[in-house]
């Protein structure tokens, strides 16, 4: 089985990694942050705006691999502010169903790659 490395044109160019790796039906998505396609941070200080951009980036990554958000089976969420959890849940509900949610791990951390980032989400999906 071949391995396909994908960097969607709708995502900011990565530096030293791939946004998406597809092996068979399994899709691995690198941690997505609140950066638009031009590399600008979206929603500095605004948790909802950042979570929304992260989910847009996840959607784009999955679309580039032939999938969508319903194909996600695992997420790892890194969050710098505990008080952003309600905003995360609210925005996530717009993008993902709670009928069969993926397994998930939430990690509170002291910081991410850019001090303006409040959240980062990496995912694994199975695309039929």
Where are these regions (language model features)?
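N-terminal presequence-like segments and the immediate start of the first folded domain
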Residues: 1-56, 60-73, 79-128
